[in-house]
C-alpha cells in the first residue's frame, strides 16, 4: 500500500539513510467505545487476534508491523488489572468494590487509547482507514 493521498502530513524524506522506510508509532485517544468494541474493531482491521491482559488492557497480535495495544489510558487501573489476585476476605472484597467504582467513573472521564506498532510511513493509509472505521462505530476525540 502507498499513502499518496493521505491526510497525515509526510516528512520530506520517507526513507532512512540505510534506505529502509521510516516508521511511525501513533497513540489514538478517544471516547465512545469500550475496550471490547475497540479491540474487536482493531483485530478485524489488522487481521489479528485479541489477547486480554486485563479488563483495562488488551493486545491485538498478528499484524506484520507488530502488536497493537488497546487500553484505558489510566496507569493505576492498568497496573491493578495486571496485579489482580482474587481475595475473598472482607478487605479484598472492599478493595475490589473500590476498584470497580473507580473504573466506572474513569470510563466516563478517561479516554480509551489505541497504541500502534511502528508503522511504515508509506502504509499510513491503513491508519487513516482505521480512524474512519472508529468514527463510523461511534468513537469521538
Predicted segment positions?
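ATP/Mg2+-dependent ligation/transfer catalytic cores
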Residues: 2-140
